[in-house]
C-alpha cells in the first residue's frame, strides 16, 4: 500500500483532504493494483508494465465522481489483463452470493438451478426432507419466508456470476445451525404450493480440513447399476479417506462393464488428487492431465499408473457446479481419450482463485496461476465441453429419471 501512503501524504502536503468516499475508492484501487502486482502468476501481469498501469489509472480514480465510476475504472484496469477470473462484484451482489443463512445444518436436500428454478435433485434417505415427503423434481420457492426467484434473477443478470456462485448462493439459503429448523415452500409434482418445516441436521459426510479453510463435510458413495460401477464424492478433499475409498471402488470393479465418476456439483479441492485417481484409470506411464503455471513454479499433473488399472469404459458426469480439480480431471482424461464426458459445460473456474472484500465493500476475485490441459486448452473462462451434452430437467426428475446418468449408462451398455 506504499502508493496509497505516498499519495495521501502528498495530498496532505498541498492541503488537499479526501472525503471518506474518496479514501475508500483510493484504498480499494490500491488493494486491487497491489494484489495483481504481488500475486499474479506472471511477474509482468498480462505482459504489461504494471507500474505504468498505476500511473495511468490512479489519477482517474482521484477524479472519479462516484463509487460506480471508480469501480468502472478498476474494472477497466483489470480488463487490460485480458484474462478471466479477475473481477469486481458490487457489494450487493457479493452479499447475495454469501446469503444470510449458512451453517452446518441441512434439511437433507440437494438442489440445482434448472431453467431459473431451484429444483430438488437429491434427497438423503433418512433426512427430515425425505420424512416430510419431499420428492425429486420439486421446486423450492422460498426459505424462511424469503423467495428465491428474485435472488436468482439478480445473480443471473450479472455476467460476472457463474453457475458455481449461483449454486453457492442457493445453498447458503437452504442451510442453518444444526438443531434448528427451516421453513421451505415447495412447488410439488402437481404444481401445488406446499410448506414444510424441516429439521436441520449435520450435513452429509465427514468433516475435513484443508489449509486455513474452515472444516467442510466430505462424502463418498460407491454403488453399482447392474454391472456398471458408480462413484460420487462432493469435493477433492479428505485425501486419505477419499483416495482409499476410490481405490477400493475401482478395485471392486475389475469385471465391471464400465465405470461412472459423478463430479456434478463438485467444486474441486486438492489438485494432486486428480493425478492420483487417474492412476487407477490410465496404464501408460508419463501421461499428463495438464500443466499449471505459477509465478515461481510449474506443476505438471503427471499420472503414475497403479499396479492394477481399470481398463473398461469410463464416463465422467459434470455440470456448471463442477470446477477446479473436477475440470482438470475431466478434461485431462478426455484429452487422453480415456473418458467420455456427459452433462453440461463446467464452471470454467479451473484456476486457484481467491475472493476478498475491498475497503468499499465490493468483492474482488483474482487468480494466482494458469492451467493448460494436455490437449492445449485453457480451461479458465472456457470450461470443459461434454462429449455428450445432456441436461437435467424437472420433468425427468419428477418421473424418476436422471437423464445424464441414463445417457452414460446407455453408452457403457453399447460398449459391451
Q: Model-derived features: where do they sit?
A:
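Boundary at the C-terminal end of the N-terminal hydrophobic targeting segment
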Residues: 15-17
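Mature N-terminal segment immediately following signal peptide/propeptide cleavage
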Residues: 19-48
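Conserved PDZ fold ligand-binding element
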Residues: 129-161, 260-264, 333-336, 341, ...
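PDZ domains, with a preference for the canonical peptide-binding region formed by the helix
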Residues: 63, 69, 136-183, 247, ...
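Terminal peptide-recognition signature
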Residues: 32, 77, 109, 129, ...
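PDZ/PDZ-like domain segments forming the peptide/carboxylate-binding groove
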Residues: 100-150, 238-239, 369-370
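Extended, small/polar residue-biased N-terminal targeting/export presequences
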Residues: 44-116, 178-183, 187-221
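Cleft-lining beta-strand/loop regions that shape enzyme active-site pockets
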Residues: 175-359, 370, 397, 411-416
